[in-house]
Structures are given as C-alpha cells and as structure tokens.
Amino acid sequence: MKKLSRKTVWLLLAVLVFTVGSGFSARRSAALPAVGETVSGFRVDRVERLDTPGGKAAYLTHEATGAALVYIEDTGAAPALTIAGRTTDGLRRVTLTADSAGELLRGAKESLGALFGAETEAVPDADAAYRAFLGCLFPGCDAAGNGAGEASAENMLAVVCAPPDGAADILSWLDGVFSAADAGEALAPDAAYCRIEKPVKETVSIAGEGTGGVYFGIVCPRAGEWTRVRLAALAAALERTGSLLDKRVRAALPDTAAVCGTASAGTDAALWFFAPGLEEKDAETFRDAVLAALRAASETGFSAQAIETLSAAQRLEELTFPERDDLGAALCEGFAAAWAQGDASGYPAQLRERWSAAAYLADGSCAEAVREELLTSTLTALVTVAPGPLREPEPTPEAAPAPTEAPAPT
C-alpha cells in the first residue's frame, strides 16, 4: 500500500478540521436565521457581536404582536431568561436561571406562563423605598411604579441567554406566551412622567424594617448621552470608600455610609445619593455634605490616586465579567434595563462606557459635568424614608374544620 506523503496528510487534516468546524458552526447558528428571516413567529431585525463577554446578540420582533426579544448566544454563560413588561403602573420583570436550556424552558412554563396575564397585587419589597424616592424625583416615571398593572403583548420583552440548539423550543414557547397575551395600546417609556419644577422635600413611610434613610437627587433636564455617560462615571467614583463623598458625609455625619447611582426618566437624567439609617432631622445635613463633595470635585477634580484606584478596579471588573457565575442573568437583566429606558441594543455600549469611567475623571469631563449640569440645577429631591408598621392581614371568614386526614395525592 502506497504511503501518503507528509504534505498530503497535513492537507487532509486541514480539510477535515475546516469541514468539521464549518459544520459545527452551521449547526450552532442554524437555530437563529439571518437578518430579515423569521423563526417561530419572530423576525430577526439585527445581529451584533458582543465585545464583552463575547458571543452574539440577536434582536427580534414578534410579528403577530410587536413584542421584543433579545437572544444572546455563544457566551458560555449558564442559561437565563428575563421577561419584562411595561404596565400602566410601571415596570414588571422576572428572571430565571437554569443549568440547561431544557431546564430553563421547563421552569419558564411552570412559573411564567400566566405572569403577565392579569394584575398583580402590589406588596412591599426591597425596592419600595427607592421607588418612593423616584416618585418624588421623577413623578410618573416607569421605575417608580410597582408593575401592578396589566401588561399587553406590545409592551413585553423577553431576553434569552441560551445555547443556539435550545432556541427553537424556547422561541416556540415565547410565541405562545406573547400570542396569548391581551392586546392593548403600546406604552411609550415614561409616558406619564412629569418633570418637577422646584426643589422637593418629602418624608414618606414604607412598611417593613430596614427601609429607612435619606435620599437626595439632582435632575439634569434634557440630558444627552454624553451627560449620562459622565454621570455614570461620577457615580462610580463617588461611591467608593475614601472618595470625596465618603469623606464629606462621614465628617458631617460620623459612621454614616453613602451610596450613589444614576436614574433617568424621559429625556432627563439624575445623580442620586442615599444614606441608610438617617432620620428626617439629618436630611439637610446629608444634602449639604453631598453638595460640598460635588463643589470640591468641580474645583479640584479627582486625585491621581482616586483615578488610578478606579481604573484598576474597573479593569479587573472588565476582565472578570465573562467569568461571573451569574453572567447569563446579568446579561439578561442588563438588556432588559436598557429596554426599559427605550432601547435594549444600548446595553453593550453602556457596558463599554462603564469601564471607561476613570478616563472621564482624568480628562476633566466629570468635573465639567458637575459644574455645568449638577451644581446649576435647581431641580432636586430630598426624601426621608421612614420605616412604617407592617399592614395587618385582612380578616378572613372562619374556615370550615379541616378534615382529620389529608386526601391522598392524585
């Protein structure tokens, strides 16, 4: 038998690898068709590569109802699913995770099938205090609602993170969920939002323990994307231990920690601050400490050490983000949050900007935003959240005597 030359062997191996690789790729991408095609009632509008954590995101529309879908694949993350709905009383959202696409689908069928079909009773939860604050800062905004209203199909979003080979079954189920949902009028993001016209100072009571504290927020009207990027960078810098905010607050209110973040409603954005455990008598002192920290940032900027510390922390976060145990859920909820603001496809850019915050501190962009956007704004909300008593359960009619023996399971 004639022996093959070494060159021929290498050529055959190359062809084999190419063939297997191409077939594997084709099988993996076959679940989601090309842009403009449809699968299980969903039309593919756009597909983009994700720089971090890798993989792809496909943006689809349910042709029968207009519901939105984001399908994330090839990230290596554990399967996850988020379903969100915009209701007349704010946003409703739930996220499921699983070890496999099949398990995710089974869990979804058990717990999500009727989630948006009827009104849900509003109950106190961990976000109730924050929502109460947003109701004062951004009256009527979606994020201030509890999602108790009914969600129609036009106002729904599903975000799926799963292997492509599980896409067909999941999309088929979602097609049924959206098709069965009640028809209704499409709601624009923050349709009921009305901007405050003067400083607001309120005290609100929230049932339950651990909800007390003081919030202070500053609204930037008609904030463009560049303003929002700089506000996010400021929040990342100021919430760190040892920051200008941390020092000013602790000097004014010893043993008090403060956190900060950003929020938006309509065309407006805001930077907010929260100190848990403070009471109404501390509210103005907290507000003044926050403003003092902002004035210091506008005058002297941020130290080289603060910039270096933030840069190192964000670089580490960027490198480890693809290795997160909850990566699938984090991606799903990130896309859903961007959708709630008006555009799900904005999430990848938000991730990139989040990891660039230190650069905006170093070049003076954040100090400029403080001077031109925050310290000049008179639209503020100072809100004290006081823990209130839990509601007593409603009395129920006397129940009939229970049987002495439980019925056998069927």
Language-model features: where?
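His/Glu-rich zincin catalytic helix
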Residues: 4-90, 106, 154-252, 381-409
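C-terminal regions of mature proteins
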Residues: 19, 25-39, 156-164, 308-410
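Structured segments of extracytoplasmic/periplasmic soluble domains
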Residues: 99, 107-119, 135-136, 150, ...
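A glycine-rich, aromatic-flanked flexible loop/lid motif
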Residues: 205-206, 212, 253-270, 280-290
